[in-house]
Swiss-Prot record:
<dbReference type="InterPro" id="IPR013126">
    <property type="entry name" value="Hsp_70_fam"/>
</dbReference>
<comment type="similarity">
    <text>Belongs to the heat shock protein 70 family.</text>
</comment>
<keyword id="KW-0597">Phosphoprotein</keyword>
<dbReference type="GO" id="GO:0051085">
    <property type="term" value="P:chaperone cofactor-dependent protein refolding"/>
</dbReference>
<dbReference type="InterPro" id="IPR029047">
    <property type="entry name" value="HSP70_peptide-bd_sf"/>
</dbReference>
<keyword id="KW-0143">Chaperone</keyword>
<dbReference type="InterPro" id="IPR018181">
    <property type="entry name" value="Heat_shock_70_CS"/>
</dbReference>
<dbReference type="GO" id="GO:0005524">
    <property type="term" value="F:ATP binding"/>
</dbReference>
<keyword id="KW-0346">Stress response</keyword>
<keyword id="KW-0547">Nucleotide-binding</keyword>
<dbReference type="Pfam" id="PF00012">
    <property type="entry name" value="HSP70"/>
</dbReference>
<comment type="function">
    <text>Acts as a chaperone.</text>
</comment>
<dbReference type="GO" id="GO:0140662">
    <property type="term" value="F:ATP-dependent protein folding chaperone"/>
</dbReference>
<dbReference type="InterPro" id="IPR012725">
    <property type="entry name" value="Chaperone_DnaK"/>
</dbReference>
<dbReference type="GO" id="GO:0031072">
    <property type="term" value="F:heat shock protein binding"/>
</dbReference>
<dbReference type="GO" id="GO:0042026">
    <property type="term" value="P:protein refolding"/>
</dbReference>
<keyword id="KW-0067">ATP-binding</keyword>
Amino acid sequence: MSADNGLIIGIDLGTTNSCVSVMEGGRPVVLENPEGKRTTPSIVSYKNNEIIVGDAAKRQMVTNPNTIVSIKRLMGTSNKVKVQNADGTTKELSPEQVSAQILSYLKDFAEKKIGKKISRAVITVPAYFNDAERNATKTAGKIAGLNVERIINEPTAAALAYGIDKASREMKVLVYDLGGGTFDVSLLDIAEGTFEVLATAGDNRLGGDDWDNKIIEYISAYIAKEHQGLNLSKDKMAMQRLKEAAERAKIELSAQLETIISLPFLTVTQKGPVNVELKLTRAKFEELTKPLLERTRNPISDVIKEAKIKPEEINEILLVGGSTRMPAVQKLVESMVPGKKPNRSINPDEVVAIGAAIQGGVLRGDVKDVLLLDVTPLTLSIETLGGVATPLIKRNTTIPVSKSQIFSTAQDNQESVDVVVCQGERPMSRDNKSLGRFNLGGIQPAPKGKPQIEITFSLDANGILNVKAKDLTTQKENSITISDNGNLSEEEIQKMIRDAEANKERDNIIRERIELRNEGEGIVNTIKEILASPDAKNFPKEEKEKLEKLTGNIDAAIKANDYAKLKVEIENFKKWREEMAKKYNPTGEQGPQAK
């Protein structure tokens, strides 16, 4: 095997299946695994200290309790999976360790196919993977001996695969990605080699496995009816065969109107062997799975609304994931975007890995004139006075991005500030997801509002957030990289967005009151500064009395939580300030005025 020449493989690390691709001769090529298949089950089995990955592990998925499936769902969490050693002892494995076994298997057979050592990869993740999940994916790659050059969103990778030959004209593209375990839908804008995600939505607890399970339930109900309530749920071998038969039936019904589910000698009872011969029509299958299909409808509407476009403005529909072969899925998508037929020119099982390989080619310089732009799924904010979530990077901002804003202290002579970072769409920090916090010390003592604290949010191309706080007077700074943002699922993100909309009116009232209180307290401090300043001796007595009265009125309104009165008194102060500006500075010359 020859030395590493900097080749970058593209990996679709899926919940149910994974795929690996590489650029060869300027075109992406999907690599077959040792069993001659172009996709590999994302399944790891531990048996007698042996680690089995892929199809071999899938064949013992039900019978071997040490078989781990859908590990992707645990990425970014502290959850562990337990497996039993040959000596009977138990060991715990992190999601990163299990995922690394899948990546290592993909890497090993890719090296054998290519004939070169491989150390670099682009790995795809669902659009809604958060910082913790993305970091966990990079860690898994590192454990597998891969330097993960870039983490990109699965729908974006798919659009890249479809769009490489179409980058010369602007298009609005809907990507409908129904995989084995997750569902994503995204709207992208593709123009002159630039791919920009306009909006994303989805459900990470919905996938082709759910369609399989409906068939399993159907067969199980038939068996129970025909065999006096026979329940096979604890018969591991029978359940393994049921699962395989259900998946096979689903695939066959994508191409034909009916199929025969044949399971001879499925199990044995006191009355003898149980044989299953059951016809399942496509119509019945679609009836059984209609509630699942309907769960994909709202996310399509959501991304169209979020992107602020009309369905007829969508130029192309891309279908991703093997489950999109189902005719009912295609019909639903077509009904949501009238007049547009989905583009199925690339194998939906392979398209994401192909896009990842193309991105690898971009990073190596082998593919020119393509720029990939992803977005952040939720607003990133810091908590400010009164618990308000002040946004720095708003939802659906294109990444990579860096945003800075100047803040100050909330108390006199404050020597440190806590920087609290949160994620979500609600105006109040407490209603959002806390991502992390850190402290900036060494601030030079000064009246509140005087120190200049610069907060910078930097979100890299992998969607990983770095937060920095810097005192512009002392130049002292501190920072953190957010590696755990609460492990938000797609469902949680969509719920947060819905909650923000549902509570918008109440939240706005709360926020307005806090802002009024903060403004009122700031005015009281400003008036005190004015009265204590050398210029105060130049003020007529009646002006000083007005200021003292304003201070008392504002202070009383704050203490009484009388926000209507507070609003009036703040306006009175602003009018007084305007009058003073005209009276003492009619020609623009500097004179005594409030700050």
